[in-house]
Design a protein with these regions (language model features):
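Transmembrane alpha-helices and adjacent helix-loop boundaries
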Residues: 1-165
Length: 165
């Protein structure tokens, strides 16, 4: 489901459904609805990242751990997950960056973030070029910084890893 549809459903649909049931005092703020929407959207992608990371570890690793007498849980904690995390970290950081960019979509429900602030400032000053230029630069600074941090983390987790020729 597209994030904007999910945000509209949670912000407008759920309160309407709850009020139809008979709860007249139910209120859902834009911040809460936006946070729920973004969390549900990112959660689906994160689950897929974790699934793929765990499946990327050779099945023989689990068999070896089990043959040594480790329980399933201990095999996952001590053998599978440490290897899977190495492959998951870049995707997790990438998903974080995507979620940060997705917050701009939530401005349509009044979610207080950078794009919403830009809209308010443009409405008050009528200086669209300057305001949107500053907003774009702010997004770029944050995204470039996060991308560089991701590269450092990626290099650090790959230290000592044998490269296949």
């Amino acid at each position: 489901v597209p994030l904007i549809v999910l945000a509209y459903f949670i912000y407008f649909g759920i309160p309407a459904a709850v009020k139809a049931i008979g709860f007249t005092d139910f209120k859902l703020t834009a911040l809460v609805a936006g946070t729920i929407s973004l969390s549900m959207n990112a959660g689906a992608y994160m689950a897929e990242i974790f699934r793929a990371g765990i499946q990327s570890v050779d099945k023989g690793q689990m068999e070896a751990a089990r043959s040594l007498g480790l329980s399933y849980g201990k095999s996952m904690r001590k053998v599978i997950l440490p290897q899977a995390i190495r492959t998951m970290i870049p995707s997790i950081i990438n998903q974080f960056i995507i979620s940060l960019k997705d917050t701009s979509i939530l401005s349509v429900i009044g979610f207080p973030e950078l794009t919403k602030a830009g809209n308010i400032i443009v409405g008050n000053t009528f200086k669209a070029l300057q305001v949107w230029g500053i907003v774009a630069v702010m997004y770029m600074v944050v995204i470039i910084t996060l991308s560089r941090v991701a590269k450092r983390i990626e290099r650090r987790i790959n230290v000592g890893k044998l490269e296949a020729n």
